[in-house]
Amino acid sequence: MSRNLDSPVQTQMAVAVFKTPLTGASKMEGKQHHKHQHLQRQSSGRRVFVQTETGCVLGMELDRSDNVHTVKRRLQIALNFPTEESSLTYGDMVLTNDLSAVRNDSPLLLKRNFMHRSSSTPCLSPTGRDLQQKDRSGPIEILGHSDCFSIVKHMVKDIVKAMKMGVEPLPVHSGLGGAYYFRNKRGESVAIVKPTDEEPFAPNNPKGFVGKALGQPGLKSSVRVGETGFREVAAYLLDYGRFANVPPTALVKITHSVFNVNDGVKGNKPREKKLVSKIASFQKFVAHDFDASDHGTSSFPVTSVHRIGILDIRIFNTDRHGGNLLVKKLDGVGMFGQVELIPIDHGLCLPETLEDPYFEWIHWPQASLPFSDEEVDYIQSLDPVKDCDMLRRELPMIREACLRVLVLCTIFLKEASAYGLCLAEIGEMMTREFRPGEEEPSELEVVCIEAKRSVTERDVFSPRSDVVGEAEFQFDLDCDDLESVYSSKIQLTDDYFTKNPFSNGRSSLGKLEESIKEEEEDEEEEEDKTENTVPMIIMKDSFFSSAAFHDKAPSLSKLSTSMKNTHLSDTTRKNPKPLTRGKSENTSSGHKSANEQLPVSASFVKVADMKEDEWVLFLERFQELLGPAFAKRKTATLSKRQRLGTSCQF
């Protein structure tokens, strides 16, 4: 079974639902659906959730004799959904026929194979009457059986009781995606639920930010639409012992009429609300007084800032702003003025490639203080190999590229803390430096580029031919047009579109160029090039020729690893203008096409294109290069003027 690192994403979307105890089934059916589910699991051992790229979801039991064809057939009968010319994917894996690799409670994605697809297919109502096609699950089902989800299980019971009593969830009006407060029978918020198909630019986004199918680049090109949910869960699972205080989080299949389902053709909201099932992140609601953007940072505990920063570095958080750091006042004797910090919203962590992270705490005075002995011990106890094994076990849909970023960042954190760097210094080494009109790789990325070059130069002496399949191009060909693969440079905040520092939606990027070229041309000549010219443009971090694209270009992995003939340009050229369509697919008023909203950003380092032996060599060389990089950073820090607030006492 072939692995496809760039195959469509493994998250779930809005779903047409079959009869359940809450959809009008008889009381007897409601009492027996759990028994039916138990008997089915005894015979098959596996329950999976199959969804289409536009949001329709169906839970089904797998028998030993089932294969990809039978799964597609069930989906076609149950949802009246066409399955011809489609692929069934499981994370990075494209399933051809055998389903033995699919684990219990796993989400699968059914995706059409057309090169140019619209996201206009509506979520159709089910028509199948056969018991085998019915989704007889309860209103909330947890995907996974980790002991870490025990708190979530109790929350689910409270919410289900409230749902049966008629307590309605409350939509969250802030943010760019769909989110809902689910309450207990007393009307108190218990959990915040974020359906994966209501993310920004996903098909059923309730706030007008539509235009993408599941698996296409989202707010960040390195985080695909529909995949933020399992990242939220990953952050919780990696926060061992609640070290950073991440609230309990799980991935669930949840059924309710409050969820949004857009008209698939025009993106309009239907007038009539119907019960739909969705895959969503399910996080414990934490009562708080305000968030970090509304409060001065001087009262924040050093330990809390350090612990949250350690987590952010491990998971390469690209969106740690003040709005997703909740602040809760601590009451009690001797607790005057003390607060507790709760980190939330980790959907943009663990990207598939390195890009520019955002750490709100990087200039806080607490971040400039040394780590405590306890914090250093915790960092040194981290084992990225065990972390990856755990995530593969609990979140089988997670991509290997995300796990490689986790390994890279954990090694970087361990080595940096052992060298004596503080949190602020580590964060600065991971953050890119912006100058007017250009963007340069971070110090971490520079080390990765050099390590990758070393591996490539070693491979030159033992060249080998690689068989390139169409699967390597799946992710790129899934995009409606070339514009879709440009990286976004958006911070996930409500006021982004009014306060974006690059107000024209575009920034000139530092660019990887060919080191051997016939002549150097100036920027104006580059802009005036004719259509016959073959410009080299940055797509993710690979060189990609537009002409080669039409000729079925060679492997992206080969091109991106061949860095021996490349160098970081001394001059920065303007980004090529993205291709535009004549008309957006979502033309209804109030809806914003994803292609119209995403500005361009660069990705200098891609880790997914290395084979296993190359990855091992890369990590060895990476660790060798860290010492000189840390020494350079220390020298630069000492030569700088003392940071404002460093002398504050806590």
From Swiss-Prot:
Region feature (G-loop): 172-178
Segments of this protein annotated with the region Catalytic loop: 316-324
Keywords (A to Z) from UniProt: ATP-binding, Kinase, Nucleotide-binding, Phosphoprotein, Transferase
Entries under InterPro entries matching the protein: P4KG1-8, PI3/4_kinase_cat_dom, Ubiquitin-like_domsf
Region (Disordered): 508-534, 560-595
Class of enzymatic activity (EC top level): transferase
Residues covered by the PI3K/PI4K catalytic domain: 166-463
Catalytic activity from the UniProt record: a 1,2-diacyl-sn-glycero-3-phospho-(1D-myo-inositol) + ATP = a 1,2-diacyl-sn-glycero-3-phospho-(1D-myo-inositol 4-phosphate) + ADP + H(+)
Bias (Acidic residues) ranges: 516-529
Spans annotated as Activation loop: 343-369
UniProt feature, compositional bias: Polar residues: 560-569, 585-595
Phosphoserine PTM positions: 593
One function term, GO molecular function aspect: ATP binding
Binding site for ATP: 173-179, 194, 283-286, 345
A single BP term in Gene Ontology: protein autophosphorylation
Enzyme Commission number, as recorded: 2.7.1.67
UniProt family annotation: Belongs to the PI3/PI4-kinase family. Type II PI4K subfamily.
Role summary: The phosphorylation of phosphatidylinositol (PI) to PI4P is the first committed step in the generation of phosphatidylinositol 4,5-bisphosphate (PIP2), a precursor of the second messenger inositol 1,4,5-trisphosphate (InsP3). Undergoes autophosphorylation and phosphorylates serine/threonine residues of protein substrates.
Protein name: Phosphatidylinositol 4-kinase gamma 7
Organism: Arabidopsis thaliana
